[in-house]
């Protein structure tokens, strides 16, 4: 394979990688917004739950029953983590990190957007 064919292959690989990473960005942004909203709701509900004077006087489950906003947002947050939201909000960086691991064997790397970085060849003496 001559160097022109290699360059074309590298360009095609780079185009595909940047296309894939950029395709993940809108979904990642939506998942981040969902995580932020649910986290803020949980924090607000927790604050209201903790400052309520009746919280110390009743049982734990009665206290949760009296604060449905906190209970629902907390259950939603836990459900989102079980569904893997913590992986979905960082999906492009996971892909880039895995590509860096593979590309390191070929003296290459890539940035977080998928652009290839060619490293100089090591000199053998």
From Swiss-Prot:
GO terms for molecular function: protein phosphatase regulator activity. One of its GO terms (biological process) is positive regulation of triglyceride biosynthetic process. Its main location: nucleus. Pfam families: Tmemb_18A (PF09771). The chain crosses the membrane at residues 33-53, 65-85. It is a multi-pass membrane protein. May form with the serine/threonine protein phosphatase ctdnep1 an active complex dephosphorylating and activating lipins. Lipins are phosphatidate phosphatases that catalyze the conversion of phosphatidic acid to diacylglycerol and control the metabolism of fatty acids at different levels. May indirectly modulate the lipid composition of nuclear and/or endoplasmic reticulum membranes and be required for proper nuclear membrane morphology and/or dynamics. May also indirectly regulate the production of lipid droplets and triacylglycerol. This is Nuclear envelope phosphatase-regulatory subunit 1. It comes from Danio rerio (Zebrafish).
